[in-house]
Amino acid sequence: MPNSIPALPAQTVGLHPAQHPRAVLFDAYGTLFDVFSVAQLAETLFPGHGQALSVLWRDKQIEYTRLVTTCNLGAHYQPFSALTRAALVFAIKKLVINEASTRAKGQIDINFEAKHGRQVQRLLDQYQQLNAFPENLAVLQELKTRGIPTGILSNGDQAMLDAAVHAAGFSGLLDHIISVDPIRKFKTHPDAYALGEQATGLAAHDIVFVSSNAWDALGATWYGYQTLWVNRYHLPFEELGTQPTRTGHDLRAVLDFFP
């Protein structure tokens, strides 16, 4: 393959001093794997609701990670796979069942599992093999060729991450696949970001953390990582007074850290 991949211009905003990083860690969901690629199947299963269902599912999934991490010192922790299912069930109940109930003027009463259990399982199975963004494989191969250590640092369970990596064809391209599950705390808890330092043996300021989730890029920046926010959808960044080290529009922007 070519020695370099043309990268889109990246906006450097810079909290950290300019320095060459020694490793790269990627968020998984939304960054390497397209969480909204389930919308097509969702539309097939729930006509007229596919896009809205995929968005609400994702929003509720993130909300649940924060809820179980911050409430009562994590006493209500559940693995990411369980929260993913719970968020999906919530989204279906809100968007599909509530609408049907409204049309029936409140007279609808169903057994959720009997009526929707198969659809739920099909969507969860799809979540195990989400589409990867098209440039990602070439970027990971390029980093591997350059000898730059890479890894995933994700809220996902280990089994979920292993399945997604395999399905995307990324096996052998990542040196670390790090799940927060052993510490029972989701990002943006500082202990979650600390796992990257522990796995690589490097200080956070020597690592680029890459995420397409603005809240995640912000949390990693606050922790001390050099950060790349992959702003695929041309959105504003969080308005909390801190910017990521760089902003790009796809994963190729990470190569700008290694001129």
Where are these regions (language model features)?
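Hydrophobic side chains within well-formed alpha-helices
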Residues: 38, 53, 119, 170-173
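Alpha-helical elements of Rossmann-like donor-binding domains used by nucleotide-donor carbohydrate transfer enzymes
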Residues: 40-41, 56, 86-90, 122, ...
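Active-site neighborhood of HAD-like aspartate-dependent phosphohydrolases
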Residues: 8-62
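Hydrophobic alpha-helical core bundles mediating ligand binding, dimerization, or RNAP-core interactions
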Residues: 42, 57-61, 84, 123-127, ...
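Short, acidic loop-to-helix structural element flanking the phosphoryl-transfer center
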Residues: 77, 81-82, 101, 114-151, ...
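A metal-dependent, Asp-based hydrolase signature
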Residues: 45, 51, 64-122
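Asp-based, Mg2+/Mn2+-dependent phosphohydrolase catalytic module
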Residues: 2-21, 141, 153-259
